[in-house]
Curated annotation (Swiss-Prot):
Residue span of region Disordered: 61-100
Bias type Gly residues, positions: 78-100
Listed GO CC annotations: ribonucleoprotein complex; ribosome
Keyword Ribonucleoprotein belongs to the record: yes
A Pfam cross-reference name: Ribosomal_S21
Official protein name in the record: Small ribosomal subunit protein bS21
Gene: rpsU
Organism: Rhodopseudomonas palustris (strain BisB18)
Family: Belongs to the bacterial ribosomal protein bS21 family.
Amino acid sequence: MQVLVRDNNVDQALKALKKKMQREGIFREMKLRGHYEKPSEKKAREKAEAVRRARKLARKKLQREGLLPMKPKPVFGAGPGGDRGRGPAAGAGAGPRGPR
């Protein structure tokens, strides 16, 4: 695997190399080959991965068809003491368990 180093910018080249390795699945492969995996464990892991993929695909399909609500986008910018989307009753005693 090769990456070009432009203008002696090693940090950028390392970042590009890491991205390529991630895309190729090298890190995952290294993790899997770090120790011996019994054939029965491998079979169970692959089966679980297939189930996970199928569920994810079905969830995405339902979201596209509008039968399942989309994941809420994270809200940024609510700093310390700011309104964090708790509605009009935000403040004293408005926690999830009521007043303490």
